[in-house]
Amino acid sequence: MKREYPESPLVGVGAVIVDRRDRDETRVVLIRRGTAPLLGEWSLPGGVLECGETLRAAVVREAREETGLLVESVEMLGVYERLIPGDQGRMRYHFVLIDFLCRPVGGELRAGSDAADVRWFTRDELPALNLAYDANDVVLKGLASAY
């Protein structure tokens, strides 16, 4: 199924990868998108579900592909829609996204797949990023409920 100008919505997953080192230091991984939509913007690692793949398996796979980290899916944080209009009244992108709180359990942080960059951010650094759509809300929710 094509992502741009799809015939029906695509189901995707997002990984809110939180590392809680101690009570005072909690950080989250974000990627700088290397492809459309939202090219060049900071966002959650994630992508489209593959046929036959569970949601939790998809979030683990996408996290590994885009960040180099092996993660454990802890809990579902929410379901979100991302609609990006195109030309002539058509929907250019339409995603239904299921975001999960994830804990890093291995691997090395590195940008991969369609990520142009990847890094850890603290809560204090988030406002300056101008995160895409509802990503800021789900990141804050993940930071608040981390383990």
Outline where the language-model segments fall:
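A generic structural micro-feature
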Residues: 5-9, 41, 90-96, 115
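Conserved Nudix-box catalytic region and its N-terminal flanking loop in Nudix hydrolases
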Residues: 25-66
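Conserved beta-strand segments that form the floor/walls of ligand-binding pockets within enzyme
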Residues: 12, 43, 75, 99-101
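Nudix hydrolase/Nudix homology domain
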Residues: 108-147
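Conserved N-terminal beta-strand and adjoining loop/helix that marks the start
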Residues: 1-28, 101
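A short coil-to-beta-strand element that immediately follows conserved catalytic motifs
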Residues: 70-79
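Active-site-adjacent beta-strand/loop module that shapes the phosphate/pyrophosphate-binding cleft
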Residues: 80-108
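Short, solvent-exposed loop/turn segments that connect beta-strands within catalytic domains
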Residues: 21-26, 38, 88-91
